[in-house]
Structures are given as structure tokens and as C-alpha cells.
Regions:
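Phosphate-binding loop that captures ATP/GTP phosphates
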Residues: 158-216
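Beta-strand-loop-alpha "switch" segments that mediate conformational coupling across diverse proteins
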Residues: 307, 320-348, 361
Length: 382
């Protein structure tokens, strides 16, 4: 168990002092620092090694979301408290980055239990609820790279969390081109260093995209390098990424081969992408049968319809009846906005955030984030 400094950010003085009295004599607590000024608290927290934060959200105020977003980039060891413990409040707490939620008045035994649990998590294992979200289609030309790039960018904006965008289309990846990046390292380089236990390569090997908390890992520089990557190395890569990034968005090839199956098997969610035409739907049907044969959980595979038009002859209900699955999301057809974004090497929201497709990707990312939180919220319900 690692010793920690506990930072209590709470507008209520009495509440701050009670929490301090509960925990100041615990063996693993170096110091308890109290703040009613959340901004000043954040400035001290980011200078601390292995901090634990107790953040009260009983009073909503301007800047709370911004402070919480910054805190998530410093530590995942965040406890959120509130006098309101409705389901909506718990969901909000988790969205703000809570590892645990405690209703007020906080009970000493609950607080000590949660602090003990967080103190026992080493920094390299902090991100325990990380999700691998793979965008996949078994047919080329469907637009999965566009979806992966823009979903990852919007997740970084919506959640304020660190998001990894990983190009595992090992022979013909395009993510770096889509975002006009020229990373000094690639996935082949990172995998080789991970084999040698150089886990500090994870951040160094990624290219940060502009001012977002989005980190890009490009495909191998040379096609022949892809041939030496093994399924075990994919497992090693994912295991390492999950220690650093709460969200990992993966783009991959359309192939069905051992590497592809390892990526799909290891993913928490698969954004299975298709378009509205008969050949694409038939291919989707075959692929879904493969997923069923591999015993994927029912909530693992999400159907995403790309280039959707309201006046399509084939309706969403027809697709759902054919595939035997509900459609999770529809991305509208907007060829010119997409091509402008690709040609400029930027995300769609940078071209036209208020276009139909810009709004769609923002709402898509919000839904993904909210649904992941919803999966976790049951354990926090009072």
C-alpha cells in the first residue's frame, strides 16, 4: 500500500473538518489538505505524487466540470461526495471521473474502506476501468477510419480523459494521414520496447493531437514490419495501454485473420460498421454470425450505420430485422464535410462542428461515454 496525500475539495468547512478527523491518523495517509477554493486545490494536487482527491459536488458552480476534467488528467484516484445521491447524481459523479461515490453524511467506515482500496492501487495500475473500443467492418470502403478518428477526438472533448487512438490496420493504416501527423514512433516500435519492459514508451511513442487529450499511435512505417507482429504482442500492447488510457479507440483492417481475431476478442466494445446496401448488409450478417460463434456477449457488438440517409429505400427496421440486432448509432451522409476534413488533416468538428455529421459524432461520443458509465453505475446505487 502506497502512502498518499489526501486533498479534500469541499465548500462546507464543517464537512472538510469531519473528513479530516476520520482519516488523518491512517497509516497510509501522509497529510490531509483542505480546500474551499477548488482551483487552488487543483494547482497543489498536480504538484503532488500519488494524490487521492475527495471532491464534493453538493453545490454546482461554474467551473466544476473544468476542474474535474483537469483532475482526471492528474489522477484517477478521485472520490466524489454529495448530499444528493440520486441515480443522476451518481452518473454525473462517474462522468466527472469518480473512482468511488459516497453519499453525505459520509460514514467513517465507508471512507476508510474506499481510501484503503485506492491507496493499494499502484500508479501504473490506476486505470482499471479502461475500455477498448474497436471500430470494425469486414468490408472495405465503409468509412471505419473516419469513424475511429472522429469518435476518438470527440471522446477526448466530451470526457476530458486521455484517449488513445491506435492504428492496428497494420499494413495500410491511414490515421496519421487523416490527422496530418508524422509521429516519430509507430506501433511496431512501441511493441518492441514493451517486450523489453520499457513501459515508459507508452506516452513517448504516441503523438498528441493538438490541444486535445488525444494520443495517436500510428501503423508500422513499413508493410513488412507488420508481418512480424504476433497475437501475444497485441495482448501485451492492450494490457499496457489499459494501465494508462481510460479510452482506447482502435482502427483495424477488414481482414479475418489471427491478428484481427485477437484484436476483436480483446475488445470491450466492437463498433461494427456497415452501410445501407444489400451487399454490405449480407456481409454484416456473415460477420455477426462469426461473432456469435465466438460467444461474444450481447452488449459487446454495437451496430453503426455509416452514410445514413433518411430517404434510403432500405429502412433501419429492415436492417435490424435482417441482422437480428438493434442499430446503436446512425452517422449521416455528408461527403463534402468528410472530404474537407480528410484533405485538411483535421477532425470533422474542426471543419464544421455544427454540421449534421459534426453534431452526430459529438452525440455519438457522449452516448458511448454515458453508456460505459451506465454499466458501472449499478455498483454505486444506494
Amino acid at each position: 500500500m502506497q502512502n498518499s496525500t489526501v486533498f479534500v475539495l469541499d465548500k462546507n468547512e464543517n464537512s472538510r473538518e469531519i473528513i479530516k478527523s476520520f482519516i488523518e491518523n491512517l497509516d497510509f495517509v501522509n497529510e490531509v489538505k483542505l480546500y474551499d477554493d477548488f482551483t487552488r486545490g487543483y494547482e497543489d494536487i498536480k504538484q503532488s505524487e500519488n494524490p487521492i482527491v475527495i471532491l464534493d459536488i453538493s453545490e454546482d458552480f461554474a467551473g466544476l466540470d473544468e476542474i474535474a476534467g483537469k483532475l482526471k488528467l492528474v489522477t484517477s484516484k478521485i472520490i466524489i461526495t454529495s448530499i444528493n445521491y440520486s441515480t443522476n447524481t451518481i452518473i454525473k459523479a462517474l462522468r466527472l471521473g469518480a473512482k468511488e461515490f459516497l453519499p453525505k453524511p459520509v460514514l467513517r467506515e465507508d471512507l476508510v474502506r474506499v481510501l484503503s482500496m485506492l491507496a493499494s492501487i499502484s500508479p501504473e495500475n490506476e486505470v482499471s476501468q479502461s475500455k477498448i473500443i474497436t471500430v470494425y467492418s469486414n468490408k472495405g470502403g465503409i468509412g471505419k477510419t473516419t469513424i475511429a478518428v472522429n469518435l476518438a477526438a470527440e471522446l477526448a472533448k466530451v470526457t476530458k480523459d486521455k484517449v488513445a487512438l491506435v492504428d492496428l490496420n497494420l499494413q495500410l493504416g491511414d490515421i496519421s494521414t487523416f490527422l496530418n501527423l508524422n509521429p516519430p514512433f509507430d506501433v511496431n516500435y512501441v511493441i518492441r520496447r514493451l517486450i523489453d519492459k520499457e513501459e515508459n514508451i507508452l506516452i513517448k511513442g504516441f503523438e498528441k493531437y493538438k490541444d486535445l487529450s488525444l494520443y495517436v499511435l500510428s501503423d508500422p512505417s513499413y508493410i513488412e514490419q507488420s508481418e512480424s507482429i504476433t497475437t501475444q504482442q497485441i495482448t501485451t500492447l492492450f494490457s499496457a495501454l489499459k494501465k494508462v488510457f481510460p479510452y482506447i479507440v482502435v482502427d483495424m483492417s477488414s481482414n479475418i485473420d489471427p491478428i484481427s481475431l485477437k484484436i476483436l476478442d480483446s475488445s470491450d466494445w466492437i463498433m461494427f460498421t456497415t452501410i445501407v446496401n444489400i451487399p454490405a448488409i449480407r456481409n454484416a450478417q456473415r460477420c455477426l454470425n462469426l461473432f456469435r460463434s465466438r460467444k461474444y456477449p450481447s452488449n459487446k457488438v454495437k451496430i453503426v450505420i455509416n452514410r445514413y440517409m433518411e430517404n434510403d429505400e432500405i429502412k433501419i427496421e429492415d436492417i435490424e430485422n435482417t441482422l437480428g440486432e438493434s442499430v446503436y448509432w446512425k452517422i449521416p451522409n455528408n461527403y463534402f464535410t468528410i472530404m474537407e476534413a480528410i484533405n485538411k488533416g483535421v477532425s470533422i468538428s474542426e471543419v464544421n462542428a455544427e454540421s449534421n455529421i459534426g453534431n452526430s459524432f459529438r452525440d455519438f461520443a457522449a452516448k458511448v461515454s454515458d453508456d460505459i458509465i451506465e454499466q458501472s453505475v449499478v455498483q454505486y446505487r444506494v
